[in-house]
Amino acid sequence: VPQEILNLPKDKPLIYCAMGSSANRAVLRTVLESFDGAPYTVISPMKAHFEKEKLRAPSNVHLFDWLPADKVNPLADVAVIHGGQGTVQTACASGTPFVGIGLQPEQEANIDMIARQGCAIRLGKRNFTRQQLLQSIESLLKDEHARKRAKEIQSLSQAWDGTKNAAKFLIETFG
């Protein structure tokens, strides 16, 4: 974890925002503008996207070229993610409730699965607004049930040894 993140003030909720390599300009712009002036500290590994699209990050958004998602997700109070398998699994393994903005049908399905478990909110990529994003974040910050469910899902995921199970499957299937 970059020292800059560890040194951030702890007086505001920390939001981890990662929209993946499939993020588009419209979604990035809406997410970016949503955080401007919001009462959060935001960390994001989307520096290249912002530079490519010539977008300016608000003062409360700290951009990085790359972040170890498995290390920074547990530090976050809420994540804002695109809903790919990796981002959803990392949020779940970290016990972090999230707002998902699926950019593809598979991502929307991933988000919906966790939303049904009570610790995620899905927003539509074409029509979400700043107000909806901030309300969703605020809802997850205040919702004790969502935080509890996120921790329960984290416990379930920790009970499985994915590496061991994958190795066992490969050996049993392919010798």
Regions found by a protein language model. Give the residues of each.
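Donor-nucleotide binding loops and adjacent catalytic segments primarily
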Residues: 1-78
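A donor-sugar binding/catalytic signature common to diverse glycosyltransferases
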Residues: 66-113
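C-terminal amphipathic helix plus adjacent low-complexity
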Residues: 130-175
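Short, surface-exposed connector motifs at secondary-structure boundaries
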Residues: 13-15, 92-97, 149
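Hydrophobic, well-ordered secondary-structure elements that form the walls
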Residues: 31, 42, 72, 80, ...
